[in-house]
């Protein structure tokens, strides 16, 4: 008897990240080759025609694991019974838009989606937010889903985590598989703090292997933090395939667990650990087991790291205050 299909919702499914994501999901990249997937795809009404074309392509791939596809514009229907919701769709910042305008536009989207998930999602729902500003969008969705445990919401900082590993591998001539215990702290924004001081390369402290504090401060941290802007500058469009890949990485490790002796970066609701204000959705080093995450405890934070973490969490606190003033949480 074949296992019950995992019902996976994807919002913004006709967008660039969605287009890169859906075929990976359907081919088994999330849970392997023995767990069928049922896709529930949400889009705004004007994009449903394009989404129909994407579904035609999914059909034409004849994926062995794809148990079904449903599409629609009503989150209360699309989210019905879903086990995993990947909230990819978000309003991009347009010309003349201030930060408050962006938060307000996305607030309406994630308020509605949070309420719909609260009403109709499966009891074991996990919610991953990729659409930016991801941390605060996740906070809005979480606040509007009071019956879903807060620990079931996470925002994507795995892309930053992966970018940091890639930069460190290039610098040291290492394989990405040699690098463990990378950490992204704070917001998925230019204030994020990629922390090499607890990372390891081949079992050795990464900062010591690099042996170049100036490179860490002046090149590594800004390169990781501003990588998205560099990609837009180079290709004329935002990172889509890498964001989709990181979305799958994050969901897979959340559901299946992190490897022994390693951790990953997830933006999750703070319990006050490491001085991050309680209730903020901030990135931490976490381990995962059976769909539950635990913040890694006991890491030493020096003055340099403390300043970086505090700067990013202050930005998150400002965003929380802004959406509170807008009545979104």
Curated annotation (Swiss-Prot):
Its EC number is 1.1.1.37. Keywords: NAD, Oxidoreductase, Tricarboxylic acid cycle. Gene3D superfamilies: Lactate dehydrogenase/glycoside hydrolase, family 4, C-terminal, NAD(P)-binding Rossmann-like Domain. One of its GO terms (biological process) is malate metabolic process. The active site is at 188 (proton acceptor). The keyword Transcription regulation does not apply. NAD(+) binds at residues 12-18, 106, 113, 130-132. It is an enzyme of class 1 (oxidoreductase). The keyword Iron does not apply. It holds the Pfam family Ldh_1_C. Substrate binds at residues 93, 99, 132, 163. GO terms for molecular function: L-malate dehydrogenase (NAD+) activity. It catalyses: (S)-malate + NAD(+) = oxaloacetate + NADH + H(+). PANTHER family: MALATE DEHYDROGENASE. Belongs to the LDH/MDH superfamily. MDH type 2 family. Catalyzes the reversible oxidation of malate to oxaloacetate. This is Malate dehydrogenase. It comes from Mycobacterium leprae (strain TN). The lineage of its organism: Bacteria, Bacillati, Actinomycetota, Actinomycetes, Mycobacteriales.
């Amino acid at each position: 008897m074949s296992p019950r299909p995992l019902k996976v919702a994807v919002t913004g499914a006709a967008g660039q990240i969605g287009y890169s994501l859906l075929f990976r999901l359907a081919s088994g990249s999330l849970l392997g080759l023995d767990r069928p997937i049922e896709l529930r795809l949400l889009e705004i009404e004007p994009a449903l025609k394009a989404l129909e074309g994407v579904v035609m392509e999914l059909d034409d791939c004849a994926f062995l694991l794809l148990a079904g596809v449903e599409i629609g514009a009503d989150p209360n229907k699309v989210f019905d019974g879903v086990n995993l919701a990947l909230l990819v769709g978000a309003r991009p910042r347009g010309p003349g838009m201030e930060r408050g305008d962006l938060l307000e536009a996305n607030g309406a989207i994630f308020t509605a989606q949070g309420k719909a998930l609260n009403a109709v999602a499966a009891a074991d729902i996990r919610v991953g937010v990729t659409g930016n500003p991801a941390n605060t969008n996740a906070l809005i969705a979480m606040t509007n889903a009071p019956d879903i445990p807060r620990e079931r919401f996470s925002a994507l900082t795995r892309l930053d985590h992966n970018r940091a590993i890639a930069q460190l591998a290039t610098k040291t001539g290492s394989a990405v598989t040699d690098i463990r215990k990378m950490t992204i702290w704070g917001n998925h924004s230019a204030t994020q703090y990629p922390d090499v001081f607890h990372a390891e390369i081949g079992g050795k402290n990464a900062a010591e292997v690099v042996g170049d504090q100036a490179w860490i401060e002046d090149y590594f941290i800004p390169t990781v933090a501003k990588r998205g802007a560099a990609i837009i500058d180079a290709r004329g469009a935002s990172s889509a395939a890498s964001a989709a890949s990181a979305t799958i990485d994050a969901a897979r490790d959340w559901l299946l667990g992190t490897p022994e002796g390693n951790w990953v970066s997830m933006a999750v609701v703070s319990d006050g650990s490491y001085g991050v204000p309680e209730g903020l959705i901030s990135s931490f080093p976490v381990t995962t087991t059976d769909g539950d995450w635990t913040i890694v405890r006991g890491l030493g934070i020096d003055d340099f790291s403390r300043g970086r973490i505090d700067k990013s969490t202050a930005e998150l606190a400002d965003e929380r205050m802004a959406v509170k003033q807008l009545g979104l949480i």
